[in-house]
């Protein structure tokens, strides 16, 4: 069986069948992971907070999920809030304004110059913030401009991981999401919360989470979802 498998692969390359298959590979890859995602959703419908199935799609639905997490899991305990993909600050400002513990710290990471690579129908440079970091008078907040690959390692060298971490992933891209999760893996503690803003994109955030948990044997348990799992929150177990 192994010999036949190896021979089939060799013949595939020898005949250069990629010329025929490659134009359709993106479609079939997306379809394959959409199926895996559908299976995952069917196995995780009974969550403490969930609006599935809802025909009313609105980004404001994430605010209900945020409030649920803030009330039921965080309970005004001090947190280290790390957001990756701050953009114009909608989520970042919500947490800054609704979580009032004076000992909490808020860290926002973004290029502020748009996507570093193409993402679906969005092109490199889309969703930029005019290359300007956000502004706030709240001294608990700090911002870090650049690729996560450039800013996160240096940040972690002096990061004091003494509080519950709330990690907000709005990186969109598979590469950015996987890099961030793998870099933060040694710092994750039981009880930490990780939110994903685009979890239902099969070959990006969903695939990154799947590969991360399977490679690092980290148990992430879903605790809430909104907008039909587009926004999904996990707790580290």
Model-predicted segments: where are they?
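Short, small-residue-biased leader/transition segments that mark boundaries at the very start
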Residues: 1-2
């Amino acid at each position: 069986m192994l010999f036949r498998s190896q021979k089939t692969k060799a013949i595939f390359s020898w005949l250069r069948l990629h010329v025929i298959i490659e134009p359709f590979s993106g479609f079939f890859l997306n379809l394959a992971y959409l199926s895996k995602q559908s299976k995952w959703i069917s196995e995780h419908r009974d969550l403490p907070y969930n609006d599935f199935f809802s025909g009313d799609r609105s980004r404001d639905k994430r605010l209900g999920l945020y409030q649920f997490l803030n009330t039921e899991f965080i309970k005004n305990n001090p947190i280290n809030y790390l957001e990756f993909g701050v953009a114009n600050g909608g989520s970042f400002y919500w947490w800054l304004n609704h979580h009032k513990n004076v000992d909490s710290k808020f860290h926002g990471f973004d290029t502020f110059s748009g996507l570093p690579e193409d993402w679906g129908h969005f092109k490199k440079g889309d969703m930029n913030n005019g290359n300007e970091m956000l502004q706030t008078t709240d001294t608990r907040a700090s911002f870090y401009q650049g690729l996560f690959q450039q800013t996160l390692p240096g940040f972690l060298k002096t990061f004091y991981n003494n509080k519950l971490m709330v990690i907000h992933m709005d990186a969109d891209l598979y590469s950015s999401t996987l890099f961030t999760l793998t870099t933060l893996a040694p710092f994750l503690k039981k009880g930490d919360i990780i939110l994903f803003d685009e979890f239902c994109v099969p070959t990006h955030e969903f695939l990154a989470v799947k590969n991360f948990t399977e490679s690092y044997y980290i148990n992430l348990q879903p605790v809430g979802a909104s907008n039909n799992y587009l926004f999904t929150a996990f707790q580290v177990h």
